[in-house]
A protein has these predicted regions:
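Residues that define the transmembrane beta-barrel architecture of outer-membrane proteins
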Residues: 31-33, 55-63, 81, 104-112, ...
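Transmembrane beta-strands of outer-membrane beta-barrel proteins
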Residues: 33-37, 83-87, 126-134, 178-182, ...
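Transmembrane beta-strands of outer-membrane beta-barrel pores
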Residues: 39-45, 69, 89-95, 134-142, ...
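Surface-exposed strand-loop-strand hairpins of Gram-negative outer-membrane beta-barrel proteins
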Residues: 43-62, 98-106, 249-280
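Outer-membrane beta-barrel translocator domains and adjoining extracellular loop/strand segments
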Residues: 47-53, 97-103, 141-149, 190-197, ...
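Residues on the lipid-exposed face of transmembrane beta-strands in outer-membrane beta-barrel proteins
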Residues: 63-69, 112-118, 132-136, 162-170, ...
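Repeated loop/turn-to-beta-strand initiation elements of outer-membrane beta-barrel proteins
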Residues: 73-75, 124-126, 170-178, 214-218, ...
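Outer-membrane beta-barrel "beta-signal"
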Residues: 200-223, 396-408
Length: 408
């Protein structure tokens, strides 16, 4: 794992570079972005299950390479108020956090991520806006049923990293900015492994940015939305068919296994990774260059019915498990929204199962969600690909990798 980690982190960084940074900057009205470097420190505190700890605070340090977009009226850059795209590294000193139980600990965590920072309002030398980040983290202080039992928040060394927050920027000099920020951050195994309670923390701090070239002129205060000229955007309906898949670590199987074997045996047990699949159809109406809304129909395949039936028998008794229904296919429909920046879209779906039979323990109700990124590369259109988190009532089910085709 130590040898493959740099390759995985590099892949994440390259992925964000391809999807949202200068590689896509050749749309109408865009010009070459400005380049800057940013370094900062934050004081963070654990934000959930706080009674599990005796010490909550830790320091976080970040280093970013920033791309400051520049665009004329009619460009996506101008429509988003000249956002900053970044690739960065963060170190979270989680080893400072102390568990109440002696059988629990964290270690330092390193994250590689891509981010977008967008100003909402500018006034003189000051600006205020929001930030969003997505990437991967690595830490060797994960769950172990014998040596780290109290840390049930993540159980694999490689984790998803998600962050969001706000910033206040002061242009101190022609090429220097001071930035105060607050953020909420999340790490989890994304159901590649279990247990997977998720690690949530929040805080704030200060950073400094140095521009290697003159900063772009905004020429306005606040936000306005000019007409976007991009051949991907045509107001009206589009239709998308897609298929995807991923893997899932079964919570019910882990819980039942932990009740039937001792801790040493559980430590040597590799929880099975169950294949998951999906088929979908979206009808989306493009309201503007930045927004689209629509409806969707989905079918899902879950291969872990055998594990669910066995686990329900252990947890609830054989009689209850025999009376429950188990079917690998489920069907649902819902609403979707896409928020576009050039040929990248943030995709959000809220759905309702009208058919789902998953036994007792895995019956999380009728609602499901999908959230992630869709990429529409010009060279392979009308095909697209995406990565998203499939969830039940906002609890991760699996990471879904999809490919699809788009028609107008």
């Amino acid at each position: 794992m130590k040898k493959t980690l740099p390759i995985l982190l590099l892949a994440v960084v390259c992925g964000f570079s391809i999807s949202g940074l200068p590689a896509t900057a050749q749309e109408a009205g865009d010009v070459r972005p400005g380049i800057a470097v940013r370094a900062g420190a934050d004081r963070m505190t654990i934000g959930s299950f706080r009674d599990s700890y005796t010490s909550l605070g830790f320091n976080s340090y970040t280093l970013e390479w920033d791309f400051i977009t520049r665009g004329e009226a009619g460009s996506y850059s101008a429509a988003y108020n000249l956002p900053v795209f970044s690739i960065g590294l963060a170190y979270n000193g989680l080893d400072e956090v102390k568990f109440r139980s002696q059988n629990g600990h964290y270690s330092g965590m390193v994250a590689a991520y891509g981010s977008i920072s967008r100003d909402l309002v500018r006034f003189g030398r000051f600006s205020f806006g929001y930030d969003m980040s997505l990437g991967l983290s690595y830490s060797d202080g994960y769950y172990h049923p014998v040596t780290n039992r109290a840390n049930w928040f993540f159980s694999s060394p490689l984790l998803m990293y998600v962050a969001g927050g706000g910033h206040l920027t002061w242009q101190v000099a022609s090429r220097i900015d001071l930035i105060a920020d607050i953020s909420v951050r999340h790490n989890s195994s994304a159901r590649f492994a279990y247990p997977n309670g998720g690690l949530n923390y929040w805080g704030g701090g200060l950073s400094a940015r140095y521009h290697f070239s003159d900063r772009p002129e905004s020429g306005r205060n606040g936000v306005r939305t000019p007409r976007i000229s991009d051949d991907l955007y045509e107001k009206g309906w589009s239709y998308e068919f897609y298929a995807g898949g991923g893997v899932h670590a079964c919570a019910a199987e882990w819980l039942a296994t932990s009740r039937t074997v001792d801790k040493e045996t559980l430590a040597a047990t590799n929880l099975r990774k169950w294949p998951m699949g999906s088929l979908g159809f979206d009808a989306i109406y493009r309201l503007s260059g930045r927004f689209g809304v629509g409806v969707s129909a989905s079918a899902f395949y879950c291969s872990n019915m055998e594990a669910l039936r066995w686990a329900d028998g252990i947890i609830y008794g054989e009689e209850a498990a025999s009376a429950a229904s188990y079917a690998p296919f489920s069907f649902g429909a819902g609403a979707v929204q896409e928020v576009f920046y050039k040929r990248t879209a943030f995709y959000l779906q809220e759905g309702y199962y009208f058919y789902r039979k998953s036994g007792i323990h895995a019956d999380h109700g009728h609602l499901y969600e999908r959230a992630g990124l869709r990429l529409y590369p010009r060279r392979i259109e009308p095909f697209f690909f995406s990565v998203c988190i499939k969830a039940h009532r906002f609890k991760a089910d699996y990471m879904d990798f999809t490919v699809g085709i788009r028609f107008k």
